[in-house]
Amino acid sequence: MPLAILLSLLRHCGVRAALPTPRHLHTSPWRADCSRASLTRLRRQAYARLYPVLLVKQDGSTIHIRYREPRRMLAMPLDLDALSPEERRARFRKREAQLQQKREEEPEVVDSFDTERYKQFWTKTKK
């Protein structure tokens, strides 16, 4: 009788050692896979500082993304190499006109700062 118990224990341990141990790391059906993770809401605190933003692509299509700054809309930059030469020149002229307006609007700073009055503070004194 003890021999039968000993053999059954050896057989049981041998079968257990031969089979891989079940690990429930990313194998359970209720865990999120790549399809489910992209369709569900974010449940992590690590994404708490990301804000929903509407991303506008170059072709005009829009996508809702999460961005680190709270903005309503974020436009992708336009590829100037893809434009025709006429469109490129028109954009350049429009941009130059805006820059000239900004230069003209710069107010002249009236300064009444007297350097001689404060010269004593930046000259080194001998000790």
Curated annotation (Swiss-Prot):
Q: Which domain of life is it from?
A: Eukaryota
Q: List the disulfide bonds.
A: none
> Which UniProt keywords are listed?
Mitochondrion, Phosphoprotein, Ribonucleoprotein, Ribosomal protein, Transit peptide
Could you point out where the transit peptide sits in the sequence? 1-32
Any one cellular-component term (Gene Ontology)? mitochondrial large ribosomal subunit
The record, for Pfam families, names:
Mitoc_L55
Task: Specify whether Transcription is a keyword of the entry.
Answer: no
Q: Which GO terms describe its biological process?
A: mitochondrial translation; translation
Spell out the coiled coil positions from the record: none
What would be an example GO MF term here?
A: structural constituent of ribosome
Compartment(s) of residence:
Mitochondrion
Mark the residues carrying the PTM Phosphoserine.
Answer: S84
The subunit field of the Swiss-Prot or TrEMBL record says:
Component of the mitochondrial ribosome large subunit (39S) which comprises a 16S rRNA and about 50 distinct proteins.
For this chain, the family text in UniProt reads: Belongs to the mitochondrion-specific ribosomal protein mL55 family.
**Protein's name according to its UniProt entry:** Large ribosomal subunit protein mL55
